[in-house]
Amino acid sequence: MSMQDPISDMLTRIRNGQAANKVAVKMPSSKLKVAIAALLKAEGYIVDFAVEGEAKPELEVTLKYFQAKPVIEQLKRVSRPGLRVYKKKDDLPSVMGGLGVAVVSTSKGLMSDRAARKAGLGGEIICYVA
């Protein structure tokens, strides 16, 4: 069975893994998933990530907890295959008044809403993380 939305699958695996207090979650790897994981690590939402395997690479994301509670409180997919959401640089959302991060796919690659605003770029809003 083919997967219709691999990014939603990734976010759901992370959400479910944290709900079950897992140390790490595994999923099929892609360049976009690795870029999202790198952004989550840079923003401090996950401990680490690694790509394993050659023929069918798997992405392993090590989840982060603080005082036995998941660091990620909210993980919401915004732009999806059925309804793409694009924003100009002036209309980029601020998640939870700046406490969260909007993952934005720009012409210069994947970046946070703050970095996109600083670079003067708009793009597709992939997800919200808080």
UniProtKB/Swiss-Prot annotation:
PROSITE patterns noted in UniProt: RIBOSOMAL_S8 (PS00053)
UniProt source species: Vibrio vulnificus (strain YJ016)
Lineage: Bacteria, Pseudomonadati, Pseudomonadota, Gammaproteobacteria, Vibrionales
General function of this protein: One of the primary rRNA binding proteins, it binds directly to 16S rRNA central domain where it helps coordinate assembly of the platform of the 30S subunit.
Coiled coil segments of this chain: none
Family, per entry: Belongs to the universal ribosomal protein uS8 family.
Official protein name in the record: Small ribosomal subunit protein uS8
BP GO terms, sorted: translation
Keyword line: Ribonucleoprotein, Ribosomal protein, RNA-binding, rRNA-binding
